[in-house]
Amino acid sequence: PELQFDTCASGGRRLDYITLSYAWPLCQSDCMCYRDHDREATQTENFCLHDWVPLHAGFTWLEPPDDYEFYSSSGNGISVKIWSFEGQHLPEDEETYNWDLAREQLNNQRKIRDIQLNGNIQPLTKHPEERENWCAHACVELSGNRGYILAFRRPGCATAEMTFKLDGVDATAAYELQGLEGFSEVVSGKTLASGFQVVIPQDRGVQLIFFKRR
């Protein structure tokens, strides 16, 4: 009774519905086991697993504290692999490491988790397996009170902005938006529902926007 255990997933091969009724993957695949892992592949994993695996997590090396790297591994949770691997100690210089950014990233991940547990995840882009495409999804709480948009512009992607339509927001309400790099705006629910533009100026870029009803 009340036994809890993690399934390491064996490269993702144990993410079957029977096993997942008893456990959840703190590390959803072996893709992230290496410091130079394929971030775009991890984004695609998360994008697709949201439809099938209610609780799942990737993990991040937090080296350097890079928003693109961190949020690429963001599922319902995230595991932090920051100490040591194959004899390498991380972070290599604890005095100069940006701990404040790491704390901000982990706090944002908690917000993502809480919204997902009370909301519906919405794919915003198609064919994330094709590297020239953005990879983006949103989640809106069932109450319509808050949600987030998480969007990646991949390396070599020529498109700097995309327009997304969100389901589940209140078209009659106003929403406060807060994002990375100091992004802040107030928009109507009608704008979020009919088409909200997200801009990511640089390729290999990410934007995470939280919104809440005023």
Task: Mark where each language-model region is.
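Active-site-proximal substrate-binding groove within the catalytic cores of carbohydrate-active enzymes
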Residues: 3-185, 199-202, 206-207
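Solvent-exposed serine/threonine-rich low-complexity stretches and specific carbohydrate-binding patches
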Residues: 186-190
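Short beta-strand-to-coil "C-cap" segments at the C-terminal boundary of structured domains/repeats
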Residues: 210-214
